[in-house]
Structure formats: C-alpha cells, structure tokens
Amino acid sequence: MVENDDSWLVLDGYEDEPAAFGVPPYVGFHIRYVCGVLEQHKIDYRYMTIDQWRLCSEVEREQILRDVSGFVCIAGAVVPGRYIRGTPISQRESSELIRGLPREIPALFGGWAVRGWKQQGWMPLRPNLFLAVQDTDATLNGFLKTGSWKHERRTSEQWTTWAQLGAQSKAVVNHPDLGTEEKRGPLTYEVEVYQGCVRFKRGCKFCIEPKKGVPIWRTPEDIIQEVKFAHDVGVQHVRLGGMTDTYTYMAEGVKELEYPIPNPEPIAKLLHGLREDERLQILHTDNGNPSIIAENIEPSTEITKTLVETLSDGAVLSFGLESADPNVHAENWLNCDASQLKSALRLINQYGRVRGERGLPKLLPGLNFIAGLNGERTETYSMNLNLLQELRNEGLLLRRINIRQVEGEGFQEIPELEFKKFKSAVRDTID
C-alpha cells in the first residue's frame, strides 16, 4: 500500500477522442478521474498541463521531479486536429519524459493514444513503468491499494466517486484557464454522460468508441451533482461529452435494434436540471448520429426542441458522415448515408437555425469528412463536394466542416492531389 504522505505529479497530456475532448480551454474528464483517485486516497499531488511543462526550464523540471514520489500522465489524443490554446503530448515527448523520470518512482501512462502507440510497438524500457490500456484511474487506484500494477476497470460506484472528487480537484482549481474570482477564464468543463457506442456490434472501422462496448449510462442526477461541485470552484461553462450520440442517451433497444429509439425524457431531465443552476453560463453538447435521427424523426424532433431550448447559442452537433461515397460507406461500416444525413440536417435546421442572445444560430450541425478510408477512389472527392453543393443549394446551414485524414494502420494511401483540391474547393466555394 502506498503511503498517503507521498506527492505525485499528474501531467495532463490532453485527450482528443471521438467522444472526449480535453484540450484547453477544455478540461477532460479522464484526467479529473485520476485526480479524484488521489483525492480519495488523500495523497498530495501537483497538477500540470503539458503546455506548462513545456514552458519549464531544464532546471525547473529537475526540481519538480526531484520532489515527487509518483507520476501519472494521460495521453489521449487519437483524433488529429488543429488546436488554439494547447497541443497534446506526442509520443516523442512521452519517451523523453520517461527517460527523465527518477528511476525509483512508479510511473503510469494512460489514455487511448498510449493504447495506440503500444499496439504499434511503443514499449519504453524503464522499471516500474505501466502503460494502462483499460481505465487509467482504476489502474492507479489498484496500485495505490496493493502496490502492484494490473489493468483494471472502474465500477459504477467508483465512476461516481472519482467524477465528483475530480470536479473539485487540482485539475480544475489549478487549471490555467479557470481564471480568478474577479475574472473567470474560458475553461470549459467536459462532463462524461455515457461511455460506449450503440453501434458496438459493428461500428465504424476507424473509430475507437465501438471498442468500448455496450453504452453505460450515468444518471441525470449523478451528472448534475458533479457539475454542481464544479460550479462550487468557479466553473461556468460545460459541454456534455462522452456521448457518441446525444440522441441515444438512455435510448430504447440499444442491444436489439440497428437504430435504437431515442428517449426524450432523460436528456430533457439532464439539460433542464443543469440549467436550474444559475451559475451555468455556456452549455453545449457534442456528437449526433444522423442515421438515428433520420430513422426516428418523431422522438428526435422532441429532443431537438429540448436542445434548442436549453443549450447556449452557437451549439454544434458533430455529424460524422465521413464520406458521401457508398463504396466507402460499405467498406468501413459508416453510420449514415447521404440520404439519412439530409433528413437529419433538415430537422436540425428547422428548429436550430433561429438566433440566440449572442446573435448565433442556436444549434447547427457540424459535418465531418475523413480522407484515406478503404474503398476511397478519385470520384469520392467529387461525390463529397457534390453533396455539399446540394446542401448549399437547398439552403441548409452548417456550423463548420472538418476535413481530416484517417489515423492508424490498415487504411489506404490518400491521393494528395485530389485531397488538396477537395479541401480548397470546400474552403473557397462552400465555407
């Protein structure tokens, strides 16, 4: 058992997953859970972001490491992106960090980036180093209780405990974007609503979320209580995260149906419950599955109305079409086709294009494309552009268009010329 007078260094390497975001000004939930474990064990620790670490001199880094008796880092950036206020830790930086750690202290690296690096052969040589491929927080908890490392998953009770303790942990109160009582910063608190994906049986081949299995929901009451604790220490802005699809929170038929039926009541209870706290300012959400919306228009309409009523203007529902090419859709088990996308876009536009108090549309879709998926051909990019032109001609609004390149092994090479032409055409003629 680890003594509680130890002092650990918790390094936030940031996470960027399909359903989790923790790059500033966002603070992710996995790093907070890690801090929640240390809070529960009453172990002293220091929280730093990777950007704060980068600004330290060699002398300052040596001094920090000299005083710690344990180290834990979350590296969860598996979705490539462009960032404004921070950059996730890289594999190279992680290797350098490991080489610089005192050899006698235990060190834990976790997050989906670590899992991906490990599968690609990343195996740093160091005594008492553990690369977690399950729940980093539960793995740390097991070590603190037994003194030995093994992969572990958190229970639902631990989930609640560490989420609530993490809400008031140093990952929040010492985050550089929290600001002061006199002048609050832009910190946005990403709260985990559920984990897993309703397409767990046959999800998108490039995505990590189906690998997490059948969705496990948190109750509205549990989430609301966690956010209240965060408000107590100065948090003002919240985004509902962890959801691969806002519309399938506590949906019906998740294990039986290809298109589970959205359940309007729980998400309404959660959103209205969060809004009852006057300390909450910005409230946004993340993902939506166009096929679920298109195949369940009636309950999806009710949920859309609730989102428009409770979310702050400027809210985005990320729609992962990825490709308009039926060939790519079939080979990669994508979650919606162009027809379903159009149906979902029409519904969101019908209610979400009204402008809020800041002058922004209340709720609009964001559209995601991924280049390099199997089955892609030269015509794929023409199909993508033609679809966007059809949406524009119909007068449907999008909040933004993300164009990314697939990460990982087992995918085909991207035709650079066609890809660049597509990106330029989108930015010049659609955006």
Residue locations for each model-derived region?
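Conserved SAM/AdoMet-binding glycine-rich loop
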Residues: 1-4, 8-11, 228-376
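N-terminal [4Fe-4S]-dependent radical SAM core
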Residues: 15, 145-194, 203, 237
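Glycine- and acidic-residue-enriched helix-capping/strand-helix junction motifs
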Residues: 16-31
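Flexible glycine/acidic-rich beta-alpha junction loops that bind and position SAM and/or redox cofactors
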Residues: 18, 81-82, 117-119, 205, ...
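Short helix-loop-beta junction
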Residues: 32-45
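Glycine-rich beta-alpha loop elements in corrinoid/cobalamin-binding modules
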Residues: 47-164
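Catalytic cores of alpha/beta
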Residues: 118-125, 299-303, 373-391
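Canonical Radical SAM [4Fe-4S] cluster-binding loop centered on the CxxxCxxC motif
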Residues: 183-222
